[in-house]
Structure formats: structure tokens, C-alpha cells
């Protein structure tokens, strides 16, 4: 690590933070909290999970913006910058468009009584869109990691 360029170190740390916030926040912590209804009812569990989901999305967005910023110097490949910007756009859309609408839709639903059915269906669709967006961000970040692991031949 001593001879490592700063852009490489920053890029690797930001990539790890972005992937970690997706996996830990959106895949492990938030679903576990929402599913744990033994101590609180389902409506309260979902309300308690909302700030965690938003903070996790904000961490991911910040890390992805850093990845996009250092991608050119870190990866030395045009595809790295493109993938970084794509991930940043997806993360921003997820945080500022999809998540607020999803949480608003779930707030209008009574999960204990499971009513109204039409609003539950709409909230489930928004949840599916959020999961697809988080998956797409993760795929783009893994593509960046693969691109970072390739050894490029030096130009002579």
C-alpha cells in the first residue's frame, strides 16, 4: 500500500463503502428490522426502518460520487468514468425519487390490517423498483471492481 496512488486508495475505499452500504443497509439491516414484528407492530417497524434506508442510500450516493470523481485517475479507462457516472445517476434517482415515494406509499398503508389493498400493491411495486435500482447499482459497482482488477498494458 505504500507505493499506491491516492486515487487508487480513495477509489477502493469509496467502492467498498458503496457496496457495503447496499449490502449491509438495503439487504441485511432494513429488511431484518422490517421483518422483526415480535416487539413492535409492522407499521412501527417499517417507520423505524425508513431513516436507516435513507441514510444507507445517502452513504451509497456519496461513495458513488467519489468513485465517479476518481475513476479517470484510478482506473485509467474511459469505461470507468462512464460506469461511475451511471452508478451516481442510479444512486441519486434511488435516493431522491424512488425511496421518498416508496416510504410515502408505505405510510398510507395499514400493515396490521393489510388495507387498502390497492395502496399495498402500489407500495410493493415501488419496493420492487427500489430493489431493482439497488441491484443495478451493485452490478455497476461490481463492473467497476472488475475493471479495476484488470491489468492494463502500458502504452509504449
Please state what every model-predicted region is:
Residues 1, 79-82, 154:
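N-terminal, intrinsically disordered, basic low-complexity segments enriched in Arg/Pro/Ser/Thr
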Residues 28-35, 70-74, 97, 101-110, ...:
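Juxtamembrane transmembrane-helix termini
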Residues 52, 59-91:
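Helix-adjacent hinge/juxtasegments
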Amino acid at each position: 500500500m505504500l507505493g499506491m496512488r491516492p486515487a487508487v486508495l480513495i477509489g477502493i475505499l469509496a467502492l467498498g463503502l458503496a457496496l457495503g452500504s447496499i449490502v449491509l443497509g438495503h439487504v441485511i439491516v432494513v429488511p431484518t428490522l422490517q421483518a422483526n414484528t415480535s416487539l413492535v407492530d409492522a407499521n412501527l417497524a417499517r417507520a423505524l426502518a425508513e431513516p436507516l434506508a435513507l441514510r444507507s442510500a445517502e452513504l451509497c450516493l456519496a461513495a458513488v460520487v467519489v468513485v465517479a470523481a476518481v475513476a479517470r485517475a484510478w482506473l485509467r479507462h474511459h469505461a470507468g468514468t462512464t460506469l461511475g457516472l451511471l452508478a451516481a445517476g442510479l444512486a441519486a434517482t434511488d435516493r431522491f425519487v424512488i425511496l421518498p415515494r416508496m416510504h410515502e406509499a408505505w405510510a398510507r398503508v395499514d400493515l396490521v390490517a393489510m388495507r387498502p389493498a390497492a395502496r399495498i400493491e402500489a407500495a410493493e411495486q415501488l419496493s420492487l423498483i427500489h430493489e431493482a435500482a439497488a441491484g443495478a447499482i451493485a452490478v455497476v459497482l461490481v463492473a467497476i471492481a472488475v475493471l479495476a482488477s484488470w491489468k492494463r498494458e502500458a502504452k509504449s
